Amino acid sequence: MSNHRILHTMLRVGDLDKSIEFYTQVMGMSLLRKNENTEYKYTLAFLGYGDESQGAVIELTYNWGVADYEKGNAYGHIAIGVDDIYATCDTIKAAGGIVTREPGPVKGGTTHIAFVKDPDGYMIELIQNKQAHAGLEG
């Protein structure tokens, strides 16, 4: 299993263009590729901070004609490591993004985190890079 790795996380979105704009303009990702499947009526967009060969990416799936999805209570969040969580949140807010939990240490711990909401309501956790490798330590 040494060659196994996570390739992508798929999120269903109601407005693909709006979601691509959020992940590129607000979160600083690049649109890596986009393709349509006319037979099954969906469009996929893959976004990330680097080439897919270098790490996991986000797959946005737009099912034609579906504007909203029931997210249920099982989904938690996507986590992204950032170099300066405070500056990153300032940049996200300046670009029109919604920070739902301001940056700061986890209650009872020292790891600095923040949360951001994407246009479809998916939560994104930001973790200070120097602490990201250790997880949420106390």
Swiss-Prot record:
InterPro entries: Glyas_Bleomycin-R_OHBP_Dase, Glyas_Fos-R_dOase_dom, Glyoxalase_1, Glyoxalase_1_CS, VOC. Pathway: Secondary metabolite metabolism; methylglyoxal degradation; (R)-lactate from methylglyoxal: step 1/2. Its EC number is 4.4.1.5. It comes from the Bacteria. Keywords: Lyase, Metal-binding, Nickel. One of its GO terms (molecular function) is metal ion binding. Binds 1 nickel ion per subunit. CDD domains: GlxI_Ni. GO terms for cellular component: cytoplasm. It catalyses: (R)-S-lactoylglutathione = methylglyoxal + glutathione. The active site is at E125 (proton donor/acceptor). One of its GO terms (biological process) is methylglyoxal catabolic process to D-lactate via S-lactoyl-glutathione. Its cofactor is Ni(2+). Coiled coil: none annotated. Substrate binds at R12, N63, H77. Ni(2+) binds at H8, E59, H77, E125. Residues 5-129 form the VOC domain. Belongs to the glyoxalase I family. Catalyzes the conversion of hemimercaptal, formed from methylglyoxal and glutathione, to S-lactoylglutathione. This is Probable lactoylglutathione lyase. It comes from Vibrio cholerae serotype O1 (strain ATCC 39315 / El Tor Inaba N16961).
